From Swiss-Prot:
Gene3D superfamilies: Ankyrin repeat-containing domain, Transcription Factor, Ets-1
GO terms for cellular component: cilium; cytoplasm
Upper classification of the organism: Eukaryota, Metazoa, Chordata, Craniata, Vertebrata
Gene symbol of the encoding locus: Anks3
Subunit structure: Homooligomer. Interacts (via SAM domain) with ANKS6 (via SAM domain). Interacts with BICC1. Interacts with NPHP1. Interacts with NEK8. Interacts with HIF1AN. Interacts with NEK7; this interaction alters the subcellular distribution of NEK7 by preventing its nuclear translocation.
Tissue: Kidney (at protein level).
SUPFAM superfamilies per the UniProt record, alphabetical: Ankyrin repeat, SAM/Pointed domain
Coiled coil regions in record: 500-575
Protein's UniProt name: Ankyrin repeat and SAM domain-containing protein 3
C-alpha cells in the first residue's frame, strides 16, 4: 500500500484482480487455490450466483452472523446489491437483526442512500423506528450522511421526524442544520417538524446552524419560526448576539471542535459528543480525555516527537465496514483542520500517519479519502476560524494561535481594531513541514530552491510536478496551504501583498475548477468525434442503399418498357385474329365454327395434340383462347412491375 499514488483511484483498484504470493518455490494446483466464497463475502462483493447457490442448498443459516456481528443481508444492504437483497428477502431472512452496535439492515441502507433496498426492507416488515445503541433511527443515519432522497423517502414512509436521541437531545432537524444540509432542512420544514425544539443544552436547530456558519439555513428557518426577543439572547449563559449578519454573528465563548462533513455511520452520537462537549456556560475546557474507540490501538509517541505527543494517534487496520475490525475508512482517513480555531493547533492527520509518527516510520502510506467532503469541510473551517478570530479581537483576547484574517474586514478604517498580536505562525518552510509531518520532503523543496513564500503559492499539480506523488503527503501540503491562506496573516503588513495572497488562494480554487471543466470538455469532444464517425458511417450506408435503389429502379423501368412493347404486339395479334375469325365465319356454317372439345385437351404446353386435325374455325377458336390467356398473364406482369416501381405509393391498382 505504500506505493499507491493519487493516480490509482478506488474504481480502478476495484476493477483489478487480486493475487496472492505463496512463497518461494511454492507450487499449487488450481484446485488447491480455488477457495470457495462464503455467504458473507459473496454478499458483500455482489456474487449473485454464489449467494443463490447457498440459498438453494438450504444447508446454511442465512441469518448467521460472522465474526464482526454482520449478516449477509447487512452487507448487501450496506453496499447496495439490490438483486442479492431481493434474493435473501425471498428466502425469508430476518430484516430486523441488529449488529453489535444495534444497526439494522434498514439503518445501513439508509446511511448509504440505498433507497430501493430500503423500500424492499420496509415491504418485508422492517421496523422504521428501531434504534441503535446510541438511540439513532434510520432517519438519523441518512440525515447525518446527507442523503436527500433517502430522507424524503423515509418521511413519506411515515418516519417520526421529531424523534430525539437520548444523549444530547438532538432531533434529525438539528443534525441536518448543524451539518449544513440545506435541502434536507427544507424537507423537514415542509414535513411540518417542530423547529423550536431544544436539545439538552438549550440550543435549537437554528442556533446550531448559526453556530456552524450555515446562514442560508438560518434564514430558511427564521421564515418558519417566530422571532425571539433579544433579551433571551443577551443572557450571560446564552450566546452574545444572534444577528443574521455575516459580519457580526459570533461563536460561543467556549472551545468546540470543528465539525467534519460526511460522517461515518459508526460515528453518529460520537460526533455529536465532540460538537457538544462543553455546555453553554461560556467556560472553555482546557483538557480533554481522549479514549480511542473500539477497533483502534493506541501507541505511545517517542521522545523525539514531543510536538506530536499532545494528540492521540489511532490506527485502523482492516475492514472498512465492521467496527469490530476497524472504524469506517471514510471516517478514519478524514483530516481535522490542523490550524483549528482554538488556543493551539490540533495535531491530527490521517490515522495511518499517526501510527507512522508514533513508531518513527515513514508516513508515505497515509492515504486520505472523501475528496468531496474535504472541500466543504475546509470552507466551513474558514468561516469558523474567521468568525472566531473576529470575536477574540472584539473582546481583546490576544492569546490566539493565529492572528485575524487578511480579508476585507482587516482593512484599516473598516471597523475599530484592537492591538494586533504578533505573527506566531511558521517562519520558514522547515517549520511548516514539520508541523504537518512531511519534514522528510524538505530536501526535495531545497533542490528546487523553494522557500516558504513560494511553497504557499504551489498548487496540487505543482507538487506533483516537483515529485510529491503520494496522495497522503500531497493532500496534507495542499490542505496546509489552503488553511494558511484562509487564516494566517502574511509576514508583511502591505495591503497589496495581503490582497495578492488572497487572490492566489482564489486562483488555486479556480485552477482546480478549470481543470475539471477541461476534463469535461475533453470528454465531450470525444463524444462529438464518435458521433461524427457514426454519422459518416451511416451516410455512407445510405448512399450505398440509394445507389442500389436507383439501379433496381432503372431495371424495373426497362422491364416495364419491354412489357409495354409485348402488350402492343399482343394488341396487333388480337386485331389480326379478329379479322381472321370474321372472314372464316363467312365461309363456314355455325356448326363448323364450334370447336370440338375432344381436340381442346391440352398437353403440357396448353396446345391441342393433333394440330393438323383441327379445322380452320377450331384452330381460330383455340388461338383466340390462348391470346386471351396471354393477355391476362401480361397484364399481371405489368401490374407487378408497377408495384415494384411505385414503392412509396399508398394505394396499388388491383389486378
Amino acid at each position: 500500500m505504500s506505493e499507491l499514488s493519487d493516480e490509482a483511484s478506488e474504481p480502478e483498484l476495484l476493477k483489478r484482480s487480486l493475487s496472492m504470493w505463496h512463497g518461494l518455490g511454492a507450487q499449487g494446483s488450481p484446485e488447491e487455490l480455488d477457495v470457495p466464497l462464503d455467504l458473507h463475502t459473496a454478499a458483500s462483493i455482489g456474487q449473485h450466483e454464489v449467494v443463490k447457490e447457498c440459498v438453494q442448498r438450504g444447508e446454511l443459516d442465512l441469518n448467521k452472523k460472522n465474526g464482526g456481528g454482520w449478516t449477509a443481508l447487512m452487507y448487501a444492504s450496506y453496499i447496495g446489491h439490490d438483486t442479492i437483497v431481493h434474493l435473501l428477502l425471498e428466502a425469508g431472512v430476518s430484516v430486523n437483526v441488529p449488529t453489535p452496535e444495534g444497526q439494522t439492515p434498514l439503518m445501513l441502507a439508509s446511511s448509504c442512500g440505498n433507497e430501493s433496498i430500503a423500500y424492499f426492507l420496509l415491504q418485508q416488515g422492517a421496523e422504521l423506528e428501531m434504534k441503535d445503541i446510541h438511540g439513532w433511527t434510520a432517519l438519523f443515519h441518512c440525515t447525518s450522511a446527507g442523503h436527500q432522497q433517502m430522507v424524503k423517502f423515509l418521511l413519506e414512509s411515515g418516519a417520526n421526524a421529531n424523534v430525539r436521541e437520548p444523549v444530547y437531545g438532538y432531533t434529525p432537524l438539528m443534525e441536518a442544520a448543524a451539518s449544513g444540509h440545506e435541502i434536507i432542512v427544507q424537507y423537514f420544514l415542509n414535513h411540518g417538524v417542530k423547529v423550536d425544539t431544544r436539545d439538552h443544552s438549550g440550543a435549537t436547530a437554528c442556533m446550531l446552524a448559526r453556530q456552524f456558519g450555515h446562514m442560508k439555513i438560518v434564514a430558511l428557518m427564521e421564515t418558519h419560526s417566530p422571532v425571539l426577543p433579544k433579551s433571551l439572547y443577551r443572557s450571560p449563559e446564552k450566546y452574545e448576539d444572534l444577528s443574521s449578519s455575516d459580519e457580526s454573528w459570533p461563536v460561543p465563548q467556549r472551545q468546540r471542535p470543528c465539525r467534519k462533513k460526511g460522517l461515518s455511520i459508526h460515528e453518529g452520537p460520537r460526533a455529536l459528543a465532540k460538537i457538544t462537549a462543553i455546555g453553554l456556560g461560556g467556560k472553555t475546557q482546557t483538557t480533554y480525555e481522549q479514549v480511542p474507540p473500539r477497533g483502534y490501538v493506541t501507541f505511545t509517541s517517542s521522545d523525539e516527537n514531543t510536538m506530536e505527543s499532545e494528540g492521540l494517534c489511532y490506527r485502523d487496520v482492516t475492514s472498512p465496514i465492521n467496527e469490530q475490525d476497524v472504524e469506517s475508512s471514510s471516517s478514519s482517513s478524514r483530516e481535522e483542520p490542523t490550524f483549528c480555531a482554538s488556543l493551539g493547533p490540533v495535531w491530527r492527520s490521517s490515522s495511518s500517519d499517526g501510527l507512522a509518527r508514533a513508531q518513527g516510520l515513514s508516513s508515505e502510506a497515509s492515504i486520505e479519502s472523501n475528496e468531496d467532503s474535504d472541500h466543504a469541510r475546509k470552507s466551513s473551517v474558514r468561516k469558523q476560524t474567521r468568525s472566531y478570530l473576529k470575536n477574540k479581537s472584539r473582546h481583546g483576547n490576544s492569546d490566539g494561535h493565529w492572528p485575524s484574517s487578511t480579508g476585507p474586514a482587516s482593512i484599516p478604517g473598516s471597523e475599530p481594531q484592537t492591538e494586533k498580536s504578533p505573527y506566531s505562525g511558521p517562519q520558514d518552510l522547515a517549520t511548516l513541514l514539520e508541523q504537518i509531518g512531511c519534514l522528510k520532503y524538505l530536501q526535495v523543496f531545497e533542490e528546487q530552491d523553494i522557500d516558504l513564500r513560494i511553497f504557499l503559492t504551489l498548487t496540487e499539480s505543482d507538487l506533483k510536478e516537483i515529485g510529491i506523488t503520494l496522495f497522503g503527503p500531497k493532500r496534507k501540503m495542499t490542505s496546509a496551504i489552503a488553511r494558511w491562506h484562509s487564516s494566517a496573516r502574511p509576514p508583511s503588513d502591505a495591503l497589496e501583498l495581503a490582497y495578492a495572497d488572497r487572490l492566489e488562494t482564489e486562483m488555486q480554487e479556480l485552477a482546480i475548477q478549470l481543470h475539471k471543466c477541461c476534463e469535461e470538455a475533453e470528454a465531450l469532444r470525444g463524444q462529438v468525434s464518435q458521433e461524427q464517425e457514426l454519422r459518416a458511417v451511416v451516410e455512407s450506408c445510405l448512399l450505398e442503399q440509394d445507389s442500389a435503389r436507383k439501379d433496381i429502379h432503372a431495371q424495373l423501368q426497362e422491364a416495364q418498357t419491354l412489357a409495354q412493347d409485348a402488350a402492343l404486339v399482343l394488341d396487333q395479334l388480337r386485331a389480326c385474329q379478329a379479322e381472321l375469325s370474321a372472314r372464316l365465319r363467312q365461309h363456314h356454317s355455325p356448326r363448323e365454327g364450334t370447336p370440338n372439345p375432344h381436340f381442346l385437351s391440352a398437353d403440357s404446353k396448353g396446345w391441342p395434340i393433333p394440330l393438323q386435325a383441327l379445322s380452320l374455325p377450331e384452330l381460330s377458336g383455340a388461338l383466340e383462347d390462348r391470346v386471351h390467356e396471354m393477355g391476362q398473364a401480361l397484364c399481371s406482369v405489368t401490374q407487378s412491375l408497377e408495384k415494384l416501381q411505385m414503392l412509396n405509393a399508398k394505394k396499388w391498382r388491383e389486378p
